[in-house]
Amino acid sequence: MVDRLKLLQAISTSAKDLASFALSRGASPIPQPVGLTDVTFDPLPLPDLNALHRRLKDAGLPPKTTKSAIKAYDEACSRWRSTVDESFKATASAVSPRNLHLLLSLRHHVYAQQVQKWLWQVLQVPELWKAEMAKQRAHITATMDTYKKPRPKFHSEYTPLLELYFHFNAYPTFADRRMLAEKTGMQTRQITVWFQNHRRRAKGPLPRMAPTDKIPMEEFERQRENMARKLLPVLLPSHLRPAPSGSENASPARSIPRATMSAAKSKKPDGDKEALRKVGKKALRDAAKTAKANSSTVLGALVAAGVQQAPEAKNSKKAKKAARKNAQDVEMRDATKSHEKRRKTKAMPRPAGQVPMDVDGRAHKKSTKTTSSAFDSKAELAFARMAYPAPSPYAWVHTAPKSSHVMPSAPFKDAHISDIRKLGKGKPSQNLTSTPATFSTVPPRRTSSRLNAMRPPYAFPATYDSASVPMTFAAAQTLRFSFVTDSQAFGFRQRYPLSVGEKVHSGAIDALTRRFESLRVLCAEFSTPKKQTSSFERQTLCRLRAEGLKAGEIEVRHLVAADSYAARRAITYVTPRAPLDSVVVDLPRALQLRLVKPLVPAEPIVRPDDFAPFVALAEKRAKRRARKEKKKQAEKEARKEEKRARKEAKQAKKDRKEQRAGLPRRSPSTLDSSRASSVTSDASATSRKSRTSRKPRDSSASSVASARTPSLSSTSSRRSSGTSMPATPRMNESLPVVASDNFVLGTDKDVTMTPELMAQLFGEDDASGLDEPMQSEGFSPDMLIFSSCNDGALGDMTADVNMPELGDLSDTQLSFDDMNWTSSMDLSTQPAASFDSSSETSSMDFNWLLPQCANTAPDWSALIGMTPSTTSQIHVLGGTYSCELGGTNTTNAPLNFADLSFELDAGEDCFINFDHNPLGGTMLAV
């Protein structure tokens, strides 16, 4: 490119040099060709004003406006015609003859384009004029107020009906107001305003019913009868109305016509009563006829009902039937009330010859009882998610019209149309051999419980659009899939069929064919025996499983037979040239001939999700159940807290009572341990006994027994005392060991332990064994328990010994404690270490005790078995300590108890540290 540019610059420079050289030699430039001076143009066409006038007139434009519009259009076209002629004549002088035809065509095009634009603007004048006139009329109507909408008439004869309804419900629902408006012939707004005004004028509490409540029909009939009695004197004819209250000569026979009375008087005296009774019947029949003639209104219906109940005499059966036929125009019934069951008379047995023969089983009628549609929410949710794992954007259910699908062939007509018609209807089918995608779980619409006040159970977000749902799968046979398509709804144009001999090879179509053949193999796996399946098909099936069709889905396919679930996940087909309903029998051939076009949309297209309301309902039920469980758990925790608070208050009250009685005060650690032991004992007791079979304990014994020192060493003492071991304390809790200062009885003198005091302090079990000699258990290394891990490391060490009573107690008191190691081992009395209140910790050496066990010291290798090499833990009196073990491999050295020394915390009464402890040549560092 750079070389070409340099070459062009050189050529331009050479041309300029040649031109300057020619001018210097006296050469003259070539003159320009002179244009045509006498160019004549054809006249431009004039606009058709007559046709424009007819079109404006037909559009409804007034003559004056039409004339002005056409005039303006004609003037504009004339000005534009003269302008174009002048401009093109000036331009034609500089145009060569060979380009003249281009100039003429350009002149005609410029003129016609502008004229056509003005013509379109003129044709828009009628619409603009109509819009402007409508706006002006609206403005005039709004400002002058000359037009008033006729006010709807209020039918006052239906006021008693509204008042009767107001007596039961002052706040009707929209469905009730609409029903009342239809019955009374008024607008819903009128009914709403009437109830608003009536509520404003009413006094006292107003009745309000829920939409699902029932109207008490007995009370309704009673109120209707009372209203009829009140309105009866007003609506009766003049000769049947009762006399005024001020008239003294008023009599029941006053309203009877004179001719009827004279006829009655002419009878014999014995028949006076019979004649009067007949005359009264006739008068009442006339009143009933009058009321029946006016029964088109509510008051007429009320009067008719009141007149029918007026006669006291018994009517015949014909009269009763006629009275039943007089139905009311406005009738309020309880829609939820079940029909009254008639008493069934037992049929008498017929002779054997008269019993009809039941040939085809018609006598055994199926039960018409509807089963409950309630399902387990978890099962519903699991089944719906298994059938449709991916949420569908088409979350509404539709029902296909009867005439929208017509099958072309008879073999698949019934099966396919039955599947299509089941969309959006009924409950989920229990038949697992059918396709779950063709059944809907949406229940039918429920009927209203009172005046159609209930709304439909599901709200559909949008109507069904066939263009957004291009395809529906349905399994016609095991190896045949039918595709319901609509070419016009997809936006495909009609395509002409290719020749039969023409073959099209495409990589996408071949891949699609192979995938469909794989699906066919998958369907054929369960339809044919495994022995007949070829090795190629088995390999294809294994590859399908590796591609994502898992064993669970194959098992589901085995249950629901060969449906289109896997095919829908794999490929999607659209048939542009196919009729509305087509069955693709040979899919590979159809793909090769392009009878079926593969569609690869941006998102997977599926049919409308029949299970969407099903899944939503199941999720809603699951959430509701979770909320209930959470609420129940919260209530349970609240009850536990309340019970714990009551128990603590009861325990505090008991402690105050013991303190007033002079009993020793317990420390918080003892209180915690006693509560833990009581909780454990309660838990163990509930499994052995029921609450009703428990015997009440003595309050003093139970309160004192809960305060005794818990046992950590002796199993026999736990059995004798009847108390269970307390729970193991955590790292941040103190050990349940009781110091001697907790047993101060209020005096400085020694207290002699008597059986009564022993029973108060430690329970009746220990008091009963007070006089018995104590068995010397003897201290042995068995109280120190060692355990090793799998790799030979020291797992843990548990010291099952009891803390001594450290304090100012006498030897006699120590001898009575069955858990005291001093008296049980028959050792010399060790002087108790006095704890100074100012010192935090003190150290006690147990060297005087350990030589007693020198002869019974076990071998280290027997205790551990292998060389310790890892980090372990040691548990001493409920406390856990981490130890790093390491050293030589000499494990034959005996365990020397003389090197064990413990450090005690005086305030917490627990072990806090070990000193250097060589265990078999292994140093123990804490």
From Swiss-Prot:
PROSITE patterns: HOMEOBOX_1, HOMEOBOX_2. Residues 267-281, 326-338, 632-660 have a biased composition (Basic and acidic residues). GO terms for biological process: sexual reproduction. Residues 428-441 have a biased composition (Polar residues). Residues 238-281, 308-374, 424-452, 625-734 are annotated as: Disordered. It is found in: Nucleus. It holds the Pfam family AalphaY_MDB. Residues 147-206 bind DNA. It comes from Schizophyllum commune. One of its GO terms (molecular function) is DNA binding. Its main location: nucleus. One of its GO terms (cellular component) is nucleus. The keyword Nucleus applies. This is Mating-type protein A-alpha Y3. Specifies A-alpha-3 mating-type. May regulate the expression of genes specific to the homokaryotic cell type. Residues 669-687, 699-724 have a biased composition (Low complexity). The keyword Zinc-finger does not apply. Keywords: DNA-binding, Homeobox, Nucleus, Transcription, Transcription regulation.
